[in-house]
């Protein structure tokens, strides 16, 4: 069985069909145009450069194009890259299904729906429960398909739902340790905090930002969605405002994208849970591609650090 792109090591030769996830134009120091392409299959993705490209080449190698690539894996300033020697657009008879090249969450959609539904069922506050169920039902199909981001963490098919399920399990464990937390608020905040991304982002494959995503962002989108849902369901009360605040503040600081800092206990905890799960996902995936006794490639979103994988640990190999 042929290896996937994430399984190749530095120095190895590559000859694979891959999907162009993104293609970004740049200008080199010599004034000539180049493309930075992110190539992916079900195992993950890798960056590559196409140098001295013509307008025709730019039109050929766009997002969602399947290509045949030959080259070798190299480490450039702590980042793993594919040095391209040959590349061409795949013929229709060579590959047929774009989903064969897309990374997916490791848990089935139906299992994630069942778990999230159970958490909603456990809510005792009827206003919080009705709002949460209404909004999830409204966006459920996209919620189960979309990634949680365009890059850095959970940026794969069903990544958004997988992120939420992990956060719900964290929220439950923390609530057991700190019983003064309002579980209804915390669970609802987890489920709703990133739900606006189904409007902010374009879809599960070659994900980009929509017009609404660029102009409003997922936080503002979901605050408005909560308000509209409350009107439709004729729900009045402080729960609506607090849920809006939890969504509004979940990034923690203005410089991280939240207009207000967390001013409710559950909002503060949600911010930490969100941050923890995102960082664990980034570290686990980087370490999963690393041999014991070696460092990961640099993880840009974690201060561009490389993480060491101790020789005595076998967790990531299981």
UniProtKB/Swiss-Prot annotation:
Its EC number is 3.1.-.-. Coiled coil: none annotated. Gene3D superfamilies: Hypothetical protein af1432, Nucleic acid-binding proteins. Residues 163-279 form the HD domain. PROSITE patterns: HD. Keywords: Exonuclease, Hydrolase, Nuclease. GO terms for molecular function: 3'-5'-RNA exonuclease activity; nucleic acid binding. It comes from the Bacteria. GO terms for biological process: rRNA 3'-end processing. It is an enzyme of class 3 (hydrolase). InterPro entries: 3'-5'_exoribonuclease_YhaM, HD/PDEase_dom, HD_domain, NA-bd_OB-fold, NA-bd_OB_tRNA, YhaM_exoribonuc/phosphodiest. Shows a 3'-5' exoribonuclease activity. HAMAP family: 3_5_Exoribonuc_YhaM. PANTHER family: 3'-5' EXORIBONUCLEASE YHAM. Belongs to the YhaM family. This is 3'-5' exoribonuclease YhaM. The gene is yhaM.
